[in-house]
Amino acid sequence: MKDFDLDSFLPYQLIVVATRLSREFSTLYHQKFGISVPEWRVVAHLAKSGTVSVREIHERVDMDKPKVSRAASRLEENGYVRKTQNPKDGRLVALTLTQKGQDMMAKLIPVADNFNAKLLDSLGPDADTFKAALKKLG
């Protein structure tokens, strides 16, 4: 049997790096606002897309629906999002950032942009190639 080199297996490399970077970034927003990684993904998506359903967020950020629902409930409890039922389909719950959520995102976006800029700087001239490769894989 041929040996398998896990360290050169691209999916493994990508998830290890993504997990490390997500953990590093999450310390920044958790310290300031007490939100978790799933909560960050929900509010970041809402900031970009406006009012959307839990189902749409689940599909867009590739998170289990129950995890999205729990994150949305915690965000609602903390006043960052508002939940409303879809009048045409009561099973669908729409999420919207509240003013408090918008204010939080106004403070978080520069932090995220700075984190991203540092990552891209660390790649130097390979940054554009790396972004293109990720886009091709995604």
Label for each model-derived stretch:
Residues 73-132:
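Charged, amphipathic alpha-helical coiled-coil/dimerization segments
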Residues 23-64:
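N-terminal helix-turn-helix DNA-binding core of bacterial DNA-binding proteins
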